[in-house]
Design a protein with these regions (language model features):
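N-terminal export leaders
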Residues: 1-10, 14
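Low-complexity, Pro/Ser/Thr- and charge-rich linker/hinge segments at domain boundaries
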Residues: 29-31, 147-169, 271-273
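N-terminal edge beta-strand
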Residues: 43-70, 160-178
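Short edge beta-strand/loop segments characteristic of extracellular beta-sandwich folds
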Residues: 62, 74-80, 183-191, 199-202
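Beta-strand signatures of extracellular beta-sandwich domains
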Residues: 87-91, 213-217, 253
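Aromatic sugar-binding surface patches on proteins
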Residues: 107-115, 230-239
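Extracellular Ig-like/FN3 beta-sandwich strand-entry sites
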Residues: 121-125, 181, 245-249
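Short acidic/polar inter-strand loop motif in beta-rich domains
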Residues: 133-139, 256-264
Length: 273
C-alpha cells in the first residue's frame, strides 16, 4: 500500500485536530491514554482497517531517548530475521505531518538496515511499520524526548539554506562482496522548508518547499522509492543497503514540492572475489 501525493495533507489536517484533543488531557495517566488514542487514530488514517501485528524483537528502532537537536534526530531502523519486506512506514506520532516517510524496496534493495535524520516537534513515539511481501503489517515503537524541531531555522538565512540545492553525494562502504548487501550513504543538499520556519533576517515564515520523492536505482532496476513529507530533516542523510550483482551505476533522482528534479549517477565497482 502506498500513500498517494494527495493523501498526505488530509492525514496531517485530520491528525492535527486529534493532536489538539490529545494535548488537552491533563496528568500522566491521561497523557498515556491520549498517546494510545493518537496511535489508533494514526493507524486508521494511514492503514485503514488493516491489522498491525507486534513487531517487537524483529523490528529495532535506535534513536536517542533525549535528542541533542530536535531538527536532526537520528533514527536507525534494523530488521532481524528473514521475513521478506517490501516497505517500511516511519510515523512520528505527534508531528504536524506524522507520516514522515514510506520506503518501498525494489529487487535490488535490502530493507534490513535504514538510517535517516528527522525533525521532532514534541515528545513523541516514533513507530516503524514494516510491510511484508504477503501484505502483513508489523510495528515497533520508540519514545523520543525532543521538541521544536519542525520550526527550527534552517541555516542563518534562506539564501544560505538554498546554496547548492540539489547537490547529491553517495558514499559506498567497502569492501564490496558479490551477493552481499552493500551499504550506501546518500547526502542531499536541500533545505526542506516545511512552512513552519521563520527567516531569521526578514522575520517572515518561509513558504514550504520540501522533498516529496526520492528514487534510487542500480543499472535501471529499483533499489528504493521514498515518499516523504515535512518531517524529513534539512539536507537529508539517508543510509540504506542494496545488492548489486555486478559493477554498474547507482542513480539517485529527487523531486520536491516545486516539481524541481535533481539527479546524479555514481559508479559502483566490481565485487571482490
Amino acid at each position: 500500500m502506498g500513500i498517494k501525493r494527495g493523501q498526505w495533507m488530509p492525514i496531517a489536517l485530520f491528525l492535527g485536530w486529534a493532536a489538539g484533543a490529545a494535548h488537552a488531557a491533563p496528568g500522566p495517566d491521561d497523557e498515556d491514554a491520549a498517546r494510545a488514542t493518537r496511535w489508533r487514530d494514526l493507524q486508521h488514517a494511514i492503514f485503514g482497517d488493516r491489522r498491525i501485528q507486534d513487531g517487537a524483537g524483529w523490528i529495532e528502532i535506535d534513536a536517542p531517548v533525549r535528542a541533542l537537536d530536535a531538527a536532526l534526530v537520528p533514527v536507525n531502523l534494523r530488521l532481524k530475521g528473514d521475513k521478506p519486506v517490501k516497505g517500511i512506514y516511519l510515523v512520528i506520532d505527534d508531528n504536524p505531518g506524522p507520516l514522515a516517510g514510506h520506503f518501498i524496496f525494489g529487487p535490488q534493495g535490502d530493507p534490513h538496515s535504514l538510517k535517516l535524520r528527522v525533525r521532532v516537534n514534541a515528545y513523541t513515539y516514533i513507530h516503524a511499520v514494516a510491510e511484508t511481501s504477503d501484505n502483513q503489517l508489523y510495528s515497533a515503537a520508540r519514545f523520543v524526548k525532543a521538541a521544536g524541531g519542525c520550526s527550527a531555522p534552517v541555516g542563518a538565512d534562506e539564501q544560505q539554506a538554498m546554496q547548492d540545492i540539489g547537490h547529491i553525494k553517495v558514499r559506498l562502504a567497502q569492501p564490496f562482496v558479490a551477493g552481499k548487501p552493500m551499504q550506501a550513504q546518500m547526502m542531499i543538499r536541500h533545505p526542506n522548508f516545511n512552512g513552519m520556519q521563520m527567516d531569521q533576517v526578514t522575520r517572515l515564515y518561509t513558504p514550504p518547499m520540501f522533498i516529496r520523492t526520492i528514487d534510487v536505482s542500480f543499472n535501471g532496476t529499483q533499489v528504493l522509492h521514498l515518499d516523504s513529507d515535512i518531517s524529513l530533516s534539512s539536507d537529508p542523510v539517508i543510509s540504506f543497503g542494496f545488492i548489486p550483482p555486478q559493477k554498474g551505476q547507482l542513480k539517485v533522482l529527487v523531486r520536491d514540492t516545486k516539481d524541481a528534479t535533481f539527479g546524479q549517477s555514481f559508479d559502483v565497482p566490481a565485487p571482490a572475489g
